[in-house]
From Swiss-Prot:
GO cellular component: endosome membrane; GABA-ergic synapse; glutamatergic synapse; membrane; postsynapse; presynapse
Tissue: Strong expression in the brain, small intestine, lung, spleen, and pancreas as well as in tumor tissues of the breast, colon, lung and ovary, with a weaker expression in normal tissues of the same patient. High expression in neuroblastic tumors. Strongly expressed in Purkinje cells and more moderately in cells of the molecular and the granular layers in the cerebellum. Detected in neuronal cells, but not in non-neuronal cells in the cerebral cortex, hippocampus, and lateral ventricles.
GO annotation terms (biological process): L-glutamate transmembrane transport; protein transport
One of the Pfam families matching this protein, by short name: PRA1
Function according to Swiss-Prot or TrEMBL: May be involved in ER/Golgi transport and vesicular traffic. Plays a proapoptotic role in cerulenin-induced neuroblastoma apoptosis.
TM stretches of this protein: 42-62, 65-85, 97-119, 123-140
Similarity comment: Belongs to the PRA1 family.
Positions in the Extracellular compartment: 63-64, 120-122
Species of provenance: Homo sapiens (Human)
Gene: PRAF2
Keyword set includes Nucleotide-binding: no
Protein name: PRA1 family protein 2
Amino acid sequence: MSEVRLPPLRALDDFVLGSARLAAPDPCDPQRWCHRVINNLLYYQTNYLLCFGIGLALAGYVRPLHTLLSALVVAVALGVLVWAAETRAAVRRCRRSHPAACLAAVLAVGLLVLWVAGGACTFLFSIAGPVLLILVHASLRLRNLKNKIENKIESIGLKRTPMGLLLEALGQEQEAGS
């Protein structure tokens, strides 16, 4: 396996402006929609990481303690999900067959814990907000030839990226190469 590398930042023109083609996904074909989201997450991961970082920095500037608490709770919830999936076959099957439900459960547990701790609004704006915007963009953005080539290189293992490792941990490795 090659070393993990962050891909280059995609041009703003490619990401959201001029050449960016956006279209609503077909809700009747959820598998194709899932492939589009996963492939866009892999291709634009550096741009998404930057957007997430900016959102987190803004929330951290306004409410630093609640932002740190939000990040810690979500990280622990994701860690528990990955650990449970690695040690328990039933959880692994559930995670692979219902990835959206597992992600929603992690976010719901995070929101519940933070609601009890008083940081629910900060969680919604600092973590859930940017994640929602990233998923909306990944759903709407149509793939181009360059995107498809980069994803094939990732899927055959010639290049490893942080998003590829995250998708693998969430049980989406079989989807990522499609």
